[in-house]
Design a protein with these regions (language model features):
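ATP-dependent adenylate-forming carboxylate-activation enzymes
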Residues: 2, 60-64, 78-97, 108-113, ...
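Conserved AMP-binding
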Residues: 60-63, 84, 163, 199, ...
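Conserved adenylation A10 loop of the ANL superfamily
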Residues: 166-179
Length: 525
């Protein structure tokens, strides 16, 4: 019986052992090999004191080894915590310490960066997957793992409600927040997603998103739910649209779930007309609205493809789908679709009263794919959940406050209108403007700072920062830029950064960010 995420691999290792599970360029693993190799790593984890409920970090590029690491951690009874290989060392160290990670699965090409991370940690790590070592840290190579540990399935007592993975996102206070998902929430999502887009064992699903991005859970778990194949798209390919398109062709990819920004780059620079992409049958996008003009162009370039708009924050996974059948130049907005049959939605005003059809309000969602909560953030958990009394069974139903403003049609179709707070998407990544602002104002020479965003012609978000200097100090902009690079992901660093003599103010003497946005939009035109 399948009730845990790693049961998917164990099931197909037994039923279709020779079926391909993962491809990465010329290399591949079938389900039998993936299961055996993940068992070996799981036994190694257990021998090195990893027990049920522990958190194990994954710090590597997309690869076959990453797939092995994910399922090995599940089998050991632990939860995986994916770490962004491109993030500053300080951010990685902060997550490791926040999550109390003792074991990190990585690769030799990350040793140099890990050395910087290790300098900021209070205690040494155990590194797995590395033949090289760093100061005070023990290392266990893949060669040793595959030579010395059993390929048999483990029998660790795990239940559906046990923690499976934690994905960290931006936090409004400047501190990243960890979204906790269980085996149950991950598996229910995998089943829902696979059924929604009609995945079968012959599908070949592209893995564009890095492991620390929530869309990746579709690429791995919905794929494994039906015994299909995951096609890993290396990071260097995602940055070169023409090579990306060629990989889609060569790998015979059938399904792809990614963000609009990546699809726009494929459309504009991917030379799609030169590729035979007849096997590509379905593209799903999520994370942010898709600019209509680019969507129309892509649909014209790929007429055989079914396009779906998938909605769902990382906290609840996917919960709506809208299949795009008719889009015109005059179209101004694409619906996010109807709430899934396994979920329930409320659209409420500021007093938590449901609004009428067609009126805007915040979207609240109750679903079995919802997170447990944020790791170690009880005060935040109190604010993001809403409990509605069930008059029939006298039970309190738990809803997640998405912070998204939507409207609901009479036919139960939801339309996304914007964000309630100051959270935006940049190239598909979720960015908290307040986190950037907190980081900017923490620079020693800065007195005040304001961070805001403007919409560009292609409807993407561009982050702007403005600041004032303390006294007569001459702020070193090179030092400031380096300061931000060491503390923020690349996509969160403001594209435009300006020093000001003063800020416009509201009547309550707060910085008037609306005025700043209008100034920036005027300067941009």
């Amino acid at each position: 019986m399948i009730f845990l995420l790693h049961h998917l691999v164990e099931h197909y290792a037994d039923q279709t052992p020779d079926a391909d599970a993962v491809f990465c360029l010329q290399d591949s693993l079938n389900y039998a090999s993936l299961n055996k190799k993940s068992n070996q790593l799981a036994h190694c984890l257990n021998k090195n004191a990893v027990k049920k409920g522990d958190r194990v970090g994954i710090y590597m590029d997309k690869s076959l080894e990453m797939a092995i690491a994910v399922y090995a951690i599940f089998k050991a009874g632990a939860a995986y915590v994916p770490l962004d290989p491109s993030a500053p060392a300080s951010r990685i160290a902060e997550i490791i310490q926040d999550c109390r990670i003792d074991v990190l699965i990585s690769a030799d090409n990350k040793i140099k960066r890990l050395t910087k991370v290790n300098e900021q940690l209070s205690k040494p790590l155990t590194l797995m997957g590395c033949s090289q070592s760093i100061e005070n840290c023990s290392s266990i190579s893949w060669a040793k793992i595959h030579a010395e540990f059993s390929t048999c399935n483990l029998r660790v007592k795990i239940i559906e409600s046990d923690l499976a993975y934690i994905i960290y996102t931006s936090g409004s206070t400047g501190k990243p927040k960890g979204i906790m998902h269980t085996h149950s929430s991950g598996l229910v999502y995998a089943k829902w997603a696979a059924n929604e887009v009609k995945l079968t064992a012959i599908d070949r699903i592209g893995n564009h998103s890095p492991l620390h991005f929530d869309i990746s859970t579709f690429d791995w778990f919905a794929t494994a739910f039906v015994g299909a194949s995951t096609i890993v798209i290396p990071d260097e390919y995602t940055k070169m649209p023409a090579s990306y398109a060629k990989l889609i062709e060569i790998s015979q990819m059938t399904v792809l779930f990614t963000v609009p920004y990546a699809l726009i780059q494929l459309s504009i620079r991917g030379e799609l007309a030169d590729r035979d992409l007849r096997q590509l049958r379905r593209i799903m996008y999520g994370g942010e609205p898709f600019p209509i003009k680019h969507l129309i162009t892509l649909i014209e370039q790929l007429p055989q493809v079914t396009f779906d708009n998938i909605y769902g924050p990382a906290e609840i996974n996917g919960c709506t789908r809208f299949t795009i059948t008719d889009v015109q130049q005059s179209t101004t907005n694409i619906p996010i679709g109807k709430i899934s049959q396994i979920a329930e939605a409320l659209v409420v005003d500021e007093n938590n009263n449901q609004v009428a059809y067609g009126e805007s309000g915040e979207l609240l969602v109750r679903t079995p794919t919802m997170m447990q909560g944020y790791w170690g953030r009880p005060e935040l958990n109190q604010n993001v959940f809403y409990f509605q009394q069930d008059g029939v069974n006298e039970l309190r139903q738990k809803f997640y406050r998405t912070g998204d403003i939507v409207k609901l049609d009479q036919d139960q179709t939801l339309w996304f209108l914007g964000r309630k707070d100051r959270q935006i998407k940049v190239r598909g990544y979720r960015v908290e403007l307040d986190e950037i602002e907190s980081t900017l104002v923490s620079f020693p020479d800065i007195e005040e700072a304001a961070v805001f965003s403007i919409k560009l012609e292609d409807h993407s978000n561009q982050v702007h920062g403005a600041y004032t200097i303390k006294g007569d100090i001459d702020c070193n902009t090179k030092q400031l830029n380096q300061y931000l690079k060491e503390r923020l992901p690349s996509y969160a660093i403001p594209s435009v950064l300006k020093v000001r003599e003063s800020f416009p103010r509201t009547t309550s003497d707060k910085i008037n960010r609306t005025a700043l946005s209008k100034e920036a939009e005027h300067d941009n035109n």
